[in-house]
Amino acid sequence: MHYQFLWENALQENGYAYQLLPQTRPLRSAEDGAAYFGIAVGQTAPVLLVEAAPSQYYLCLLAGDRGRLDLVKAAALLNAPKLTPVKYKKVYDITGFEPGNMPLFGLNFPCLFDEALLRYPLVYGGSGQENLTLAVDPRALLALHQIAARLK
């Protein structure tokens, strides 16, 4: 059983398909999540927090098969001089979530959206509750986030 997430109302009101899927163990990588749910690695949606300047953060919504984010390319797309991944403890201090458990919704940062997520009817990522994965229509990510740039 889970509590009602605030973002669930927005998904329902806008008609986006989603499911909350319980897990029996933590999932620590895109490959681990794909194997657990029997999906393609590209169907997983890891969330990365990056910093462009002091206290200027971007949420990166990525396809799991992208590999490492090209920070130089991402910075150019966001018109930022440079991007650095936010360190583990600082991610928790800023968001209240540990890296690897950051939710696809509920964090109010401008986003870099990976268009590769649109290959699938549902993508799988964090719900914000440990051992509960969100499978959601990737178009909801585009519609319900402040998209600063799109990664092709």
Model-derived regions, located:
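Extended, low-hydrophobicity, polar/charged segments
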Residues: 1-152
